[in-house]
């Protein structure tokens, strides 16, 4: 569970860092770029710890996929970016992919021990 929390922190840091890049580019100067640098760095640090117990492909796909989803939503809400029909279809496809990837990470059940046979 701890490593999933680290992955969630990596995702939040990535979203914050990427949004601060846009924030800096629309006129808020160096503070946005400094925040971007710090948050993207933290994001990779958290991700590097998360992949100690979460498969790299799964962690990276969730990190990037969930990040893109929330960055797009916040870009529409905060920066008045346009959400076209194609973007909506892409986001829905992304959500389906995230669900499929996450459902494929369930731990297998404990192996059943073979009954020991009595020797005659």
Swiss-Prot record:
InterPro entries: Small_drug/metabolite_transptr (IPR000390), Small_multidrug_res (IPR045324), Spermidine_export_MdtJ (IPR023740). It holds the Pfam family Multi_Drug_Res. Keywords: Cell inner membrane, Cell membrane, Membrane, Transmembrane, Transmembrane helix, Transport. The keyword Calcium does not apply. GO terms for biological process: glycine betaine transport. It is a multi-pass membrane protein. GO terms for molecular function: amino-acid betaine transmembrane transporter activity; antiporter activity; choline transmembrane transporter activity; spermidine transmembrane transporter activity. It comes from the Bacteria. Catalyzes the excretion of spermidine. Belongs to the drug/metabolite transporter (DMT) superfamily. Small multidrug resistance (SMR) (TC 2.A.7.1) family. MdtJ subfamily. NCBIfam families: PRK10452.1. This is Spermidine export protein MdtJ. It comes from Salmonella arizonae (strain ATCC BAA-731 / CDC346-86 / RSK2980).
């Amino acid at each position: 569970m701890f490593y999933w929390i680290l992955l969630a922190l990596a995702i939040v840091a990535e979203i914050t860092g990427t949004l601060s890049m846009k924030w800096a580019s629309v006129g808020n100067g160096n503070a946005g770029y400094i925040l971007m640098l710090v948050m993207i760095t933290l994001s990779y640090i958290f991700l590097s710890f998360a992949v100690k117990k979460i498969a790299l492909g799964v962690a990276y796909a969730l990190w990037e996929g969930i990040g893109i989803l929330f960055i797009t939503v916040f870009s529409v809400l905060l920066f008045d970016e346009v959400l076209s029909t194609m973007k909506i279809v892409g986001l829905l496809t992304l959500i389906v992919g995230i669900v499929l990837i996450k459902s494929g990470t369930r731990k297998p059940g404990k192996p059943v021990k073979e009954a020991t046979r009595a020797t005659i």
